[in-house]
Amino acid sequence: MTLDNLPTDTPARISAVDWSQLVEEEARRLRALGLDVGAVVRVEHRGVLFGRDPLAIRIGRMMVALRRVHACAMSVEALVEVGA
């Protein structure tokens, strides 16, 4: 599943990123924010207009607004929370 399809409030680990879908400068910035393979993320909110863009993504203690086109390049695996 890709990050743009991850249900809201579901923790997931980024399992792969197709960097070829992104402009080099955008890819560099996303890596600098920690959005790379192995990072644990959670979709907190989606936009309400224009294709539900952008997505509010939590990574650690940081909240990042991410365009859907960028989220489409990231494959994720949902994590099972302890006690769930």
Q: Predicted segment positions?
A:
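Short, basic/aromatic beta-hairpin or loop at an interaction surface
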Residues: P7-Q21
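Short alpha-helix capping/helix-loop boundary micro-motifs
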Residues: V23-R29, F50
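Glycine- and charge-enriched low-complexity intrinsically disordered segments
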Residues: R68-A84
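Short, compositionally biased
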Residues: R31-A32, D53-L66
